[in-house]
């Protein structure tokens, strides 16, 4: 098992019970997509936002196939609207 730190911003934070960050324990070999699936089970309202976010691992935009390592920081980055 490894631990990753997950950060939530904006509407995603609201969907996650206003949790700004949390440490999540996952299996070795877990990728970002598996982590998102796990978090959607914990926070069902998160499903409504996952099509409109990008994921970052250690402050770099990362695909869902990115395998996580112990201590990684994973952030849900919501889209920004402009005008």
Curated annotation (Swiss-Prot):
<dbReference type="GO" id="GO:1990133">
    <property type="term" value="C:molybdopterin adenylyltransferase complex"/>
</dbReference>
<dbReference type="Pfam" id="PF02597">
    <property type="entry name" value="ThiS"/>
</dbReference>
<comment type="pathway">
    <text>Cofactor biosynthesis; molybdopterin biosynthesis.</text>
</comment>
<comment type="function">
    <text>Involved in sulfur transfer in the conversion of molybdopterin precursor Z to molybdopterin. Probably plays a role in host phagosome maturation arrest.</text>
</comment>
<keyword id="KW-0547">Nucleotide-binding</keyword>
<dbReference type="InterPro" id="IPR016155">
    <property type="entry name" value="Mopterin_synth/thiamin_S_b"/>
</dbReference>
<protein>
    <recommendedName>
        <fullName>Molybdopterin synthase sulfur carrier subunit</fullName>
    </recommendedName>
</protein>
<dbReference type="InterPro" id="IPR003749">
    <property type="entry name" value="ThiS/MoaD-like"/>
</dbReference>
<dbReference type="GO" id="GO:0000166">
    <property type="term" value="F:nucleotide binding"/>
</dbReference>
<dbReference type="InterPro" id="IPR044672">
    <property type="entry name" value="MOCS2A"/>
</dbReference>
<dbReference type="GO" id="GO:0006777">
    <property type="term" value="P:Mo-molybdopterin cofactor biosynthetic process"/>
</dbReference>
<keyword id="KW-0501">Molybdenum cofactor biosynthesis</keyword>
<dbReference type="InterPro" id="IPR012675">
    <property type="entry name" value="Beta-grasp_dom_sf"/>
</dbReference>
<comment type="similarity">
    <text>Belongs to the MoaD family.</text>
</comment>
